[in-house]
């Protein structure tokens, strides 16, 4: 099955003529020739995933009482000043 130069030119002849008639659009990779939508014009819907926010504060009653409680306030001189300052200001709640 040896092809001669004339038979190859005959095989490529209609392709080159259709390319000339179509303006070379088949070389641009247009998907319209395959019956598929052109994906370059469709909007890209992409889900953005970042770090979750809003869950930084996880309250602990034990830590709250240890840091700001009555026993802790009275155990240091500065804590006593905090209690006296709040009493002088008229606070109903002096500590946790």
UniProtKB/Swiss-Prot annotation:
GO BP field: translation
Which InterPro entries does the record match to this protein? Ribosomal_bL34 (IPR000271)
Instruction: Tell where it localizes.
Output: Mitochondrion
GO molecular function (one): structural constituent of ribosome
Cystine residue pairs: none
Modification Phosphoserine occurs at: 75
GO CC field? mitochondrial inner membrane; mitochondrial large ribosomal subunit
Q: Which UniProt keywords apply?
A: Mitochondrion, Phosphoprotein, Ribonucleoprotein, Ribosomal protein, Transit peptide
The annotated transit peptide is positioned at 1-50
Q: Subunit details for this protein?
A: Component of the mitochondrial ribosome large subunit (39S) which comprises a 16S rRNA and about 50 distinct proteins.
- Tell me which family the UniProt entry assigns to this protein: Belongs to the bacterial ribosomal protein bL34 family.
The name of this protein is Large ribosomal subunit protein bL34m
Originating organism: Bos taurus (Bovine)
Designated gene of the protein: MRPL34
